[in-house]
Curated annotation (Swiss-Prot):
Matches recorded under InterPro entries: ITPase-like_fam, Maf-like
Active site: D64 (proton acceptor)
Enzyme class: hydrolase
Similarity comment: Belongs to the Maf family. YhdE subfamily.
SUPFAM superfamilies, alphabetized: ITPase-like (SSF52972)
Pfam families recorded: Maf
Cofactor section: a divalent metal cation
Species per Swiss-Prot/TrEMBL record: Thermosipho africanus (strain TCF52B)
Name assigned to this protein: dTTP/UTP pyrophosphatase
Entry's localization field: Cytoplasm
Any one Gene Ontology BP term: nucleotide metabolic process
UniProt main location, coarse: cytoplasm
Length: 191
């Protein structure tokens, strides 16, 4: 049985490929504008809604990542100005990246979240402008991708690196493995 990844995120696709398991991509199409002020609950709710929107049989994996600084939640920047504002706000500070994950099995739904703390260097206006113009980070929570050029913005990280990229693959693996979903001899999902 294949896993269905309810995401078109190239980063999540690449991370799931690291697990060497068979999967197909069926992007969810939900309205992500929900009213939730708690970033952990927001990420978990969005991942849950994404997973539940997929009606095909199989193990559905969905995720949503948010960045939070103090009480502000950063999703994907709307435009250049918004990306600049986000990166300027994160400059020289610790922030938290939260990824909510939902795995929908036939008879069970598991939702959890992972938190990783990231500290940015002090970013000059020129570096922020260069980054936005070069990396085009408009599809990334917080306006940056740590696995790409965004790595030059980061001073320290505490926690799961892959969570910041968009999927805490170790925890996903553990859940699939613990439920006997991985056939170690074939490297595929069991039925």
């Amino acid at each position: 049985m294949k896993i269905i990844l309810a995401s078109k995120s190239p980063r999540r696709i690449e991370l799931l490929k690291l697990l060497k398991i068979d999967f197909e991509v069926i992007p969810s199409n939900i309205d992500e504008n929900i009213s939730e002020k708690d970033p952990k609950l927001l990420a978990e709710k969005l991942s849950y809604l994404k997973a539940m929107s997929i009606k095909k049989d199989g193990v559905v994996l969905a995720a949503d990542t948010v960045v939070t600084l103090d009480k502000e939640i950063f999703g994907k920047p709307r435009d250049y100005k918004d990306a600049f504002r986000m990166l300027k706000s994160l400059s020289g500070k610790w922030h938290t990246v939260i990824t909510g994950v939902t795995i929908k099995f036939k008879d069970e739904v598991i939702t959890f979240s992972e938190k990783t703390n990231v500290k940015f260097k002090n970013l000059s206006k020129e570096l922020i402008e260069f980054y936005i113009n070069t990396a085009k980070p408009f599809d990334k929570a917080g306006g940056y991708g740590i696995q790409e050029l965004g790595s030059v913005l980061v001073e320290k990280i505490e926690g799961d690196y892959f969570n910041v990229v968009g999927l805490p693959i170790s925890k996903v693996w553990d859940i699939l493995w613990d439920r006997g979903m991985i056939d170690a001899s074939k490297g595929e999902i069991n039925k």
